[in-house]
Amino acid sequence: MEGFFRIPLKRANLHGMLKAAISKIKANFTAYGAPRINIEDFNIVKEGKAEILFPKKETVFYNPIQQFNRDLSVTCIKAWDNLYGEECGQKRNNKKSKKKRCAETNDDSSKRQKMGNGSPKEAVGNSNRNEPYINILEALSATGLRAIRYAHEIPHVREVIANDLLPEAVESIKRNVEYNSVENIVKPNLDDANVLMYRNKATNNKFHVIDLDPYGTVTPFVDAAIQSIEEGGLMLVTCTDLSVLAGNGYPEKCFALYGGANMVSHESTHESALRLVLNLLKQTAAKYKKTVEPLLSLSIDFYVRVFVKVKTSPIEVKNVMSSTMTTYHCSRCGSYHNQPLGRISQREGRNNKTFTKYSVAQGPPVDTKCKFCEGTYHLAGPMYAGPLHNKEFIEEVLRINKEEHRDQDDTYGTRKRIEGMLSLAKNELSDSPFYFSPNHIASVIKLQVPPLKKVVAGLGSLGFECSLTHAQPSSLKTNAPWDAIWYVMQKCDDEKKDLSKMNPNTTGYKILSAMPGWLSGTVKSEYDSKLSFAPNEQSGNIEKLRKLKIVRYQENPTKNWGPKARPNTS
């Protein structure tokens, strides 16, 4: 530091001296006690409010496609903090007198105090006792870009631990932290992520937010993260191993990593990937009498990303079995049927008091062969069966994206895509797992592909609900049974299909010729009397959403985009 302060203090303006010192650090970037760094060895990459020195040797990699992930993560942590603070405020109002009595008896020298049910920690030693703060762990930090963005862009952040197991990565984090002047917030750390989290759990120094973004599966880090997160804390989880989670092979590896089998060769495989990850989180949390609440679950490009709130709730742990399911899906026509593992019922006991009875479910819901096409059923799961999103949380994320990030496209370059994808997610049916593609069904029964609004209008006229899905373009989620789906799709064809011209061995022929067997006369008469393809509320909602000028799905942004190879550390 001697070289920066050779001007005598008597003749120097303190402000000017500090400004010159900071400028010199930025320009020459010499770490104290270390040799000068040649800035020509680095590419300076700007993302959000952070600038990182990206080594040209690529010992630590930067993937620009992941900016959407990081923009979304910043926005979601802000939304969680806002909602989290509101919950704490309500709790403080309800227990104001009790907290006042506790404050009078507490030791004023205490450094920190927890408020409410998992509220952000508050600095008791500060002049403002009600000023909240957040501690964040980025367990697998690589360059430190995400941690630096959290420090720059999220209010109330007191500390971000930027951890990595590779010494080269930690050196990169140190350079970037100092280059961005966030040394007081971002703390580079060289450690095994699990060891770090278990250590913090043992010392009761837990994190409010834990971000797990590994190369591949998140499974090895889940147990430690669940135990080291604060009550009501936010976990951000990424899995990039979609060849296992959503591919047509490796069911044994999927089961070993996630405790369930994926929907092999099925269109809904990306949603089943989300449900397998959420089931892993729920099963792990249940061992510690905790539960995870999905706030936002997205299938994005080449990975899945879920945002969950972790809290202690022995009562909700009892519901885990009934919110877990297996799925029977036909290998030929694609129809599927879900089987919950447990059931919940209300019973009347002594003194006319009701109690909750937990029991195993009855099944299976299907025969050995598909009733529509005589195809073979494959089994997927166990996996999570409940809602993927929290509507209130998504609305807060969209509000921040629209209002607080307005006119900040240079900082949040993926604002439009966040708006588009989350608008779809917010309007998804919450109680209808999986989706179907009218294009696929039309190809099965040899029909011209009908307009999406026509299919939705038909299902809506029969009294069923429909929604788009964020996971796949031109696909629908619905609470309609599969006999209604096949019926409506057949009726979408203006001309009656001549079965004599179809190959009897095809799936489409088997479905259409067997209709009297799987669609009873009573149900068919009801469908015939109700069916209409005139616009209705369901089709109107779909068309309104489709007409919005928003970016719904990712277009190929660069040549050879996608997951990068592992960094070369040799």
Curated annotation (Swiss-Prot):
One GO cellular component, as annotated: nuclear inner membrane
GO BP terms in the entry: tRNA methylation; tRNA N2-guanine methylation
Nucleotide-binding keyword on record: no
Effect of residue 203 to S: In strain: D4 and YF+
Domain Trm1 methyltransferase: residue ranges: 43-489
CDD domains: AdoMet_MTases
The entry's keywords: Acetylation, Membrane, Metal-binding, Methyltransferase, Mitochondrion, Nucleus, RNA-binding, S-adenosyl-L-methionine, Transferase, Transit peptide, tRNA processing, tRNA-binding, Zinc
Gene3D superfamilies assigned: N2,N2-dimethylguanosine tRNA methyltransferase, C-terminal domain, Vaccinia Virus protein VP39
Biased composition (Basic residues): 92-101
Binding site for S-adenosyl-L-methionine: 70, 146, 164, 195
Presence of the UniProt keyword Ubl conjugation in the record: no
Motif Nuclear localization signal per UniProt: ranges: 95-101
Outcome when changing residue 517 to R: In strain: D4 and YF+
EC numbers, comma separated: 2.1.1.216
Similarity comment text for this entry: Belongs to the class I-like SAM-binding methyltransferase superfamily. Trm1 family.
Protein name: tRNA (guanine(26)-N(2))-dimethyltransferase, mitochondrial
Originating gene: TRM1
